[in-house]
Amino acid sequence: MINIAKEHKVNEQIRVRQIRLIGGEGEQIGIIDTRDAMNMAREKGLDLVMVSPQAVPPVCRLLDYGRFRYEQQQNEKENRKRVRSQEVKAIKFRVKIDDHDFKTKTGHVRRFLDDGHKVKVTIMFRGRERTHPELGERILVRVAEALADVGTPEGMPSMMGMDMNMIMAPKQAPAPKKERTEESAEKAGSAGETEPVPAASAAAEAPANV
């Protein structure tokens, strides 16, 4: 795979007389005049893009530059999203928290989990509250139960100073049963083996009608 830089010379921006050309399917065409390569690009409805300007002669490739840029931007967006998902967000609760505040803060945790973030849930103790860690544990249990559909606790709660902490991680959605069944069928077919599925088993695995 050729790594194309963000800034490239495209079509008429390519001023050299000869280039080494790579076709739209990655095939090596060889060293040809740039003018001939431009004509070839026009005939195929593609762009001539310089992918390796330091080579002698420079290497160019035939491709749909607009589509390539779109795919590159989508990949960059996914990479940024992946980096953001590695951030750990933090939401703090008090030991004495009313139902309204609990619901509001739990909603914040839910949004972070939905966005793919881990969340550190912190219970803050004041004064003598620290002598009753079970109060903080109860709140953390409530949080975990309220968010069981979108997240799971990582490890046990831990005390740090006057705070009790628990990390909630996003829950990965399981692959649909239909896809797993099709994948198994493909593997069995490629191996030249087919095994009968008992009727009871097939009925159990079939998704329920809603």
UniProtKB/Swiss-Prot annotation:
It is found in: Cytoplasm. Keywords: Cytoplasm, Initiation factor, Protein biosynthesis. Residues 187-210 have a biased composition (Low complexity). InterPro entries: T_IF-3_C_sf, T_IF-3_N_sf, Translation_initiation_fac3_CS, Translation_initiation_fac_3, Translation_initiation_fac_3_C, Translation_initiation_fac_3_N. One of its GO terms (biological process) is ribosome disassembly. One of its GO terms (cellular component) is membrane. The keyword Protein biosynthesis applies. Coiled coil: none annotated. Residues 176-186 have a biased composition (Basic and acidic residues). Residues 169-210 are annotated as: Disordered. GO terms for molecular function: ribosome binding; translation initiation factor activity. Belongs to the IF-3 family. IF-3 binds to the 30S ribosomal subunit and shifts the equilibrium between 70S ribosomes and their 50S and 30S subunits in favor of the free subunits, thus enhancing the availability of 30S subunits on which protein synthesis initiation begins. HAMAP family: IF_3. Monomer. This is Translation initiation factor IF-3. The gene is infC.
